[in-house]
Amino acid sequence: MHDSSWTEADILGVCSFLDIPKTKIDPLLQVDAFTSILIPLISKSKDYESIKNDRIVTEVNYEQQLRNSEKKLLQSNERYDLLEDERKLLENELSQIKEYLREKSSSYDTVLHDCSSLKSVNEALKQAQDQNLKQTAQLQNLLSDKEKEVEKKITIIKDLKDALASSTHQVLELQHTQQEKASLQTNYEFELQKLTQKNSILENNNTWLSRELQGVNDKLLSLHQEASLEKSQLSSQLSDAVLEKDALQRKVSSLSQQFTESNLRYQNIVAELSEMRKQYEFSQVSFEKEISSQKQISELWMEKCEDCSLRLKELQNSNGELEKLLEAAQSSFEEQLESHKEAEASLKSQINFLEKEVSSLESQLKLANERLRHYDEIEISDMSELKYSNLLNNSMKGFKGQSSVSDLYSERLYYKQKYEQTCQEVERLQRSYNHVMEEANLQHPLVKEQFKRFAHMQREIVAMSEQYQKSLEDCQKAKSRYEQLETLFKDKCTENKHYEQETKDLARQVQVLLHELDLCENGIVLGVDSRKKINSYVEKSLTEDETDTDQIISSRLVVFRNIRELQQQNQNLLSAVHELADRMEKDEKPDLDGAEIQEETLIKANETIDQLTKMLEEVSDQLRYSLKERDFFRSLVQENEKLLDMAPATPNSKLNTNLIEQTSYQRSLIRLEQLTNELESLKSISRNKEKKFEEAISSLQLEKSNIQLQLTSLTSERSLALEKLNDLEKSLVLSERSKDELDESYKSLQEQLASKKIEVQNVSSQLSICNSQLEQSNHIVDNLKSENLLLTSVKDKLKADLSNLESKLSSLQQDNFHMKAQIESSNQEYTATVDSMNSRILELSNDLRVANSKLSECSDDVRRLTLQNSFDLREHQTLVLQLQSNITELKQDITLQRTVRNQLEIQTTELKERLKFMEERQENLQSKLIAANKDTTQNPDNVEVEAISIELERTKEKLRMAELEKSNIQQKYLASEKTLEMMNETHEQFKHLVESEISTREEKITSLRSELLDLNKRVEVLKEEKESSSKELAKQLEDAVREKDSALSFKKDYEKIRSDADRVITSLKEDIEKERSLMKECHSNYESEIVSHGRTTQKLRDLRTEFDEVNTKYLKLKANFEQQHSGLSGAEKDWNIQRKAMEDEISSLKDYILGLENQNKLLHSQFDSLSQQITVLQQNSSENLNISANLEAVQDNDLRELVSYLRHEKEIMDNKYELTILDNRGLNQQVKSLQSTVDSLQLELNRLQSLPVSNDQTDTPIISGSQEVQLLYESNSVLRKDNDAKLGKIQELEKEVEKLNASLNPLQTEINELKAEIGAKTASLNLMKEYNSRWKLRFQSVLNKYERVDPTQLEELKKNCEALEKEKQELETKLQETAKETDTFKQQVNSLNEEVENLKKEVEQANTKNTRLAAAWNEKCENLKKSSLTRFAHLKQELTNKNKELTSKNAENEAMQKEIESLKDSNHQLQESASSDAEQITKEQFEQLKSEKERTEKELADSKNELEHLQSEAVDADGKTEISNLEKEIHELRSDKEGLVQQVQNLSAELAALREHSPTQGSLENADEIARLRSQLESTKQYYEKEKETEILAARSELVAEKEKTKEELENQLNEKSQRIKELEEQAQKNSSENTHDNIDDMIKQQVEEKLKENSANFDVKLKKVVAETEFRSKAKISVYEKKTRDLQNKITQLEETIENLNKQLSNPEKTDESTSSVTETKPVTSKPTASKADVGQNATEASSAKREPSGKSLSARLQGTGKQKGVQRPAVSRPVPMKPDSGKLSITGASKRIATSKNAAQNAKELSSTAKSGSLKRQRDDANKGGSSSNQKKAK
């Protein structure tokens, strides 16, 4: 029986112990005999498991401890080796530094010697400088006196100029008053002439009216009889007229509404502008405030930055001092170490030598003793003498040996004493080193704090800089916003002006339209006179503010009565634009030619300038040499005169003369010797100076070379130290690699343990085979006992090993303590050396400063020399530039005079041509006036003829004056050319001299600069070497400190590791116990899970079967759902299309019915009014043509030609006048420049002549030398400042580098630590993964054995089942919703069908009405055509006559041009002859000519204005009014006709759409409807093309009108400014005639030119603004029209897409049949013939497009765009013409069909194939399911 004393876990433990399965033990448990055996087995199994676990734990712990101890030993050994290597390196560096210091001391002595010599030189230079300063002070006093005199003269000149200006102002005012009087008189005369002309016209009109009244009275009698008959007709027509009046009133109200809307828009725009201005002002104020605040912030930041910079400088100074102290200490320490090492080495060598000698003496003594013993044994008798001799020798040798040993002993004592002394010195040095290290440690926290402060300040500076940059960015953004607002404001202003103009034009148009409506209502037909009166009334209605250009635009461009008038206006504008462009090109050609001529003259002038400069240089050289010779000869003459005075007055004149000659000769020789001696002394002084400078430079170079050698040695040492450091780093890397290898080996051992466990399991399985052999179990038990004994022995051994390890650890700790003590001692020594090195570095820095000061003094001297040379060069350059400017001005004057001459010649030719032309014109006018005005009593044109004759006389006088002026200018030109040649010669001489001096001085400067650069480079190299050495020492110090810190951290880490190891051991033991308990619980849970797993497998199988059933049901439901969904989607699409079409049709039909009713009323009323108007027009036209043709035909044409000709001449004269003004400006500028150059040259010559001659020539080199010294001294101060600033920057950068290095080191340490942690974690993760994978494999193997299912799969299957059930429920709800929606759709379709039937009835009624209207309309059209054709024939005849007249006039113009060319040639010949014979003309005569010319031009302008006014009055007197009225009526009829056609087309399209959607109608009706829809689409395209063309023409006309407005405004501005320029020129000329002073003339001319320049600049700016505004407006309008065309194109593309969709639907007739059958199940389906796909789609889309775009623009742009996109050719569109059909209904013919290319067909085929492929996949299941349903339906049919 089973006993309850053990558990299942005990049984499992026995099974694992015996390697027997539980199935075999379970039957044995029921046996009582087995229970007695099982109890001891359970206890043994438990013991076995505990021993096994303990063994594993001990092995793991032992291995870990061994590895840790080995690692620690390796690390300690490596660190010890590193410290020893560093100590050796420091000793080597100390020895090198000592040598370096010795060399520096020697160089320092040489530098001091050089300084003393330089000081003596500086004192001599200072004395010379003082003398120079005194001389400069005297010269400055003279200059000040002269300047005062000049200022007095300038004040006098200014007073004279003011008086002159006041007098000129008074003269100008008088002239102005005279001109105003003359203009008033001319205006009065002109108005009288106008009044006389008007009176004559009114008298003619009265006579004509009296004649017409008589004819009208006769007709009234006949009409009175007919009136009684027509009263009955008029009563019926009154009702129609009332209706027409209502329609017109509606139009008027619509126009007034538009006007009010435009006013509202204008007001809104004004309000928006005011708001924008307010916002702009507010934003401007806010921006100013922000800018001020940002400025304050920036100032605060700058102050903070300055404070920070001061603090930084303080920190840098403190850090520099610390570094210097450390370097001095280090250097001293290294020196001491080197001395001690040398002493130790020498002592060791001596000791070794002494030891060798002592050993050799001892060996000799041994040999002697042995020999004595040997000789004692030998017989004394035979060898007595020999023994005696041997003994003597041996004794002598011993004596010698004893003496050498004593000497050695004494030397040994002496060296021992020295050794002790050296040891004492070493101890003393160590104490000092320790003291220095303590001081460094004390100052270390202070240094750290300073570094922290420095870092903090740097962060603050960075933050401040970022804020400053942000503020700058904000300022820039604010500025950009401000600019954007300004541009917006300008745009709004321009838009505002544009809207104002539009409102004015609209008001004008509205007034004209209202007037014409009133006339039409009253039935009044206006004639020529009445139109003139209306125009005068319109002109009076304009405001006074509007200019003449605005009146012209409002009367000619804004107001129009027909489309023809608009087209004519546009054509006129285009022709005017082309003419203007041609004229601009012609006007620009002479400017380009003049520019090329000016360029050539400039090139020649430059060449002459170069020649003049060369001549000037040569002349200046000659002057210098001549001055020197003159001074020399003066000195000789003075000396000779003194000798003559001193000589006695003897009678022998010959003797006196000989004496005088001899004495003079001797004196001259003495003087020459003195001069030569002085030159030699100066040369010697200069040589000495140069030698001294060279010596100083050589000494500095030697110092530099020495320093470079020392630096190279230091760099080599540094490289060696770096190599050693690299080796140490490599050793550390190797140690880390060894650590990693050990970790890997540990992992491999763990894997081996796992593999061994697996092998143990295999062995246990093998043992299970031998379960039958129970007898062997006893032997196994014995073996186990023996194994337990072995385990106990192993435990004892492990304990012994642990004790040994602990002892080793203690020894290691002791070694560590010793190492720390050694490290501390080495640190103390290191600090001592650092202090000594710092002191030495300070000394060296002082030496370097002294050397730098010497170098700076030398560089100052060099700089002074360079500055003096540059000063001289600048003076020469100024002289050269002045000469060049003078020459250029002379050349400009010459060119100006040439251009003036050419212009005068051109003017004379033109005036002669005009004279001839005016004479001919006068003759023609007189002949015409005599022929035309025989019947008239008065002759108003005589005044004009007289004025023209006066003008001719004046022009002749002007020609004479111009020729005289031409000759005067030629003489001036010749004189100026001569002066130019002289100036060129002098300029060239001066240029040669200046270039020679400049070249010599530049060579000197280059040599001095090269020397200075070399010195600066040397100094920089020395600085860099010093900085590098200081950096290396600092790095070494930091490394030593780090090593100390690392040693301390190592100690702490070791203690932590030991404590952690103890903790880990305890925690591992606890974990082992916990794991044992967990294993037991897991085993029990595993058994229970196996049992539950069997149950779940059965449930899973059941669930799988259920899931398969549910899945099959789901697939069936899904297939049904997809079928129904596809059917529903198709039905929805069809229903939506039908609904939209029906709604559109309903709305369009309602609108159409209302429109038809209104149109019927309008047609009736218009028909009656047209009949009346035609009769009245026929009567009036017959009478008017006979009367007015004879009177006005001749006058109108002549006047028009005169006006056009005079306008053309006026424009030409204006352009020429502007060109002459520009040329005059250029000439004036050139004259001024030449005069200024002449004045400057004269001043220079006077200055050179008045220069005083210096007697003291000996002092000149000293003065120049002192000036050079002073200049060098001043320049050297600048270099010092720059040097100090650069040194500060270098120090700051060095500190930043050090900080970065300091921050990098801890980061690297942290990175290494993190890497180590990551490696440990990755290893632990890998172990856990392996452990997990093993457990999973084991679990799966168990499941596979027992054939059970995984619980994770079970959970996944459950989730899938739940999701499928949710989907099933959702599909059911969707099916219910779709069924409800289908019911609602069916109801809506039935209601729509009822509405369609009602609409059909209404359409039939509308068709009957349309047939009646069409018949009446056709009759009216035919009548109108006949009447209009007759009128047009008459007009064509008139046009042909006018064309003939034009051709004849063109021939006359050509003949006139030929005569003009011949006159030009003759005029040119006359000018050439007149240039030789003409005399000079005074300025007063020239001014008179100009004044007369201006008067004639004014009179011409007045006459032209009068002619233009007459022409504007005569233009409206033509017989165009009747034609315009007819055209207007025809246009209205056409518009009504097109409206009817559109309405009919809309109705037909709607009917087609209804028939298309109603499935009960026949196929023949569908074909007719498709044809109608095609025609309707083409008609809509044509209609929209026409509308687009009209809109484009209107836009173009608007743009042209705006351009003309701007052009006229600019022309007015130009005329005003040209008048102002003329006035200024007159003022300048009068002033020049009255004043004689040339300087005053120049001032006046300058003022005039400045004003002209300002006016021209302002005008150019305004021109640019106006042009930019016009361009902007035109671009904006073009963009608006482009947007409209794009919208139309997009709509067309949408329509075409809908057509394609309908084609696709029609391509599947079976599907359409099925969809229709589903909608209408009760109605039978009839067979349809297949219609064309494109026709059906077009019908559907045309109806929708006609409804969507009733008021849109033309469709031509859209059709073109779509054609380009899809490769469709543009169709040949023909206008639809309504015809009267046989059936009584309207039909449209002439509509062209769209011709599709092969490309379009291919593309459509590809699209259909792609859609078919995409739809075929969706419909495969539908086809399978529909097979059965379709067969059943066929059977039912």
UniProtKB/Swiss-Prot annotation:
Compositional bias (Polar residues): 1468-1479, 1700-1730, 1753-1763, 1795-1814, 1827-1837
Coiled-coil portions:
59-378, 415-519, 559-625, 661-1163, 1222-1637, 1675-1712
Q: Which UniProt keywords apply?
A: Coiled coil, Cytoplasm, Nucleus, Phosphoprotein, Transport
Q: Which GO terms describe its cellular component?
A: cytoplasm; nuclear periphery; nuclear pore; nuclear pore nuclear basket; nucleolar peripheral inclusion body; nucleus
Disordered: where is this region? 1464-1521, 1602-1642, 1700-1837
Q: Which GO terms describe its biological process?
A: mRNA export from nucleus; protein import into nucleus
Gene3D superfamilies reported for this sequence? 1.10.287.1490
Bias-annotated ranges (Basic and acidic residues)? 1480-1521, 1617-1628
Give the GO molecular function terms: structural constituent of nuclear pore
Q: Which residues carry this modification: Phosphothreonine?
A: 650, 1560
Phosphoserine PTM positions read 1558, 1563
Q: Where in the cell is it found?
A: Cytoplasm; Nucleus
Q: What does this protein do?
A: Functions as a component of the nuclear pore complex (NPC). NPC components, collectively referred to as nucleoporins (NUPs), can play the role of both NPC structural components and of docking or interaction partners for transiently associated nuclear transport factors. Active directional transport is assured by both, a Phe-Gly (FG) repeat affinity gradient for these transport factors across the NPC and a transport cofactor concentration gradient across the nuclear envelope.
- PANTHER family tied to this protein: NUCLEOPORIN NUP211, NUCLEOPROTEIN TPR-RELATED
Record's protein name: Nucleoporin nup211
Query: Where does this protein come from, organism-wise?
Result: Schizosaccharomyces pombe (strain 972 / ATCC 24843)
